[in-house]
Amino acid sequence: MAVPLSLGPVHHIRLTVTDVERSRAFYTELLGFQIAMDAPLPADDPHHDLTVDLLQDGIVMVNGDLLLGLRPVDTQRTNDRFDPFRCGLDHLSFSMASKADLEAAAQAFEERGVVHSEISDLPPFGIAVLPFKDPDGMALELTAPL
């Protein structure tokens, strides 16, 4: 019999991207993430090697309680693109407080030329969603209660 676990909200996510700087701009300028760490600690810091291993030439950003890491794609796979139909991530959804926040986000997307779908109400789940994609084509959405 499985032991029930009491899980909290997602702590962190790491995405593999084709261009860390392009994705950094997208996630900071459009979604409000702040840079938490974008370089290993100094060489004389006892945790230097750990941060080199953990960052993997990428960055870590924060928005509220969520940490989002970006790491570069393996250079041998430069033509690889996100595909929600392969085994792995289908999409990633970020919570917002209200449907009005989704509408404001849709307007900001329009102003910045970010392609997105219309806001859709999903009454069986009690939410509205605003689907869009990041620069690597990863399926994202903003979600708010109805």
Regions found by a protein language model. Give the residues of each.
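Core segments of cupin and vicinal oxygen chelate
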Residues: T16-L67
